[in-house]
Amino acid sequence: MSADEPMGFREITPPALAPMFGEHPPQSLDKDERYTPAWVFQGLGLVFDLDPASPGEGNGDCVPARRKLTKADDGLAQPWHGLVWLNPPFSNATAWSNRFIEHANGVFLGPIANGRWTHQMMKTADLLWLCRDFAFTHPTHSGKRSSMPLFFAAYGERAAGGLRRLAESARHEGVLVRQEQAAVDQYRRAEHELAEAG
């Protein structure tokens, strides 16, 4: 470990990664009310342009975003712009995650699932796994923990910088994975060729 690496973290680059979990996200809409704790945003040190899955002001929301879309706004159907924060509803993680991958500019917090989108993020985004779970916030049941392992994914230089800051400031041990651009480009070309051959 070099002197530049945060204590308790190790940085690796693919292909040292492999699919890790075969669990599926919970399907109950009741499970969707998980609000990210403030220390995550303090660690990231970013102001986002958009939170497309916001619980709304006064509902335990502490996301530093200039624009927030709630369930009533249907963030999946709206245009996304700039740096995006996404903690998606776990009951529909696939649709939200695919949209985030397509947008490719921002920070994602979600469950590790045995889905194509998880594998795609593992190959194309900078990643951070916190080895211990953490409590989400909620106005009526704060402290609720995820039954799923979670990870952060970042697309874009600003988002990746925020993820590195979070790794340095997190109170938990974890693993930070930084993608090499050449490997990302190669993966995207192969995906495009497969889609065209389809």
Give the location of each predicted region:
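Class I S-adenosyl-L-methionine-dependent methyltransferase catalytic core
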Residues: 2-198
